[in-house]
Amino acid sequence: MTMNDLERYIEAHIAPEDELLRELDRETHLSVVQPRMLSGHMQGRLLEMLVRMLAPKRILEIGTFTGYSAICMARGLPVGGELHTIEVDDELEAIAARYFARSGLGDRIFAHIGSALDLAPALGLFDLIFIDGDKREYPDYYRTVSYTHLT
């Protein structure tokens, strides 16, 4: 089985991408320098499923980008759950904020702009942490949040 075969199989067996996420994907590809960094439909569905299965009350996402994965994870949150997402690039803030508001999940998504290494320590404990920021910073992100920020 090739990767293309696997992707076709997955696409055939998951719910189609909804209009909001399709629009976010399109806008990201039209207006952002590195659109390939978008999590996308398959990854988004996987993240939403994991959140539904684990039922975390608090999620930390490092690396908002344009907000696709944050919306997917927020959709899976239990009642009263919240997602904190950190993005270092303030130029992406407007796109993410607009789609967070349109998603109807704006009251569950808390966006923070700045360095995750600086901001995460003040955000408290989390049940789930999704690291998807600057790949060179992964070891530092992991050290910053893995032992002191997981419940």
Regions found by a protein language model. Give the residues of each.
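A short, conserved alpha-helix within the catalytic core of class I
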Residues: 136-144
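Class I SAM-dependent methyltransferase Rossmann-like catalytic core
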Residues: 31-39
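Class I S-adenosylmethionine-dependent transferase superfamily signal
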Residues: 73, 145-146
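N-terminal auxiliary segments of SAM/dcSAM-dependent transferases
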Residues: 1-17
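A short acidic, Gly/Pro-enriched loop at the edge of an enzyme's catalytic core
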Residues: 121-128
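Conserved small/polar residues in nucleotide/adenosyl-binding loops
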Residues: 148-151
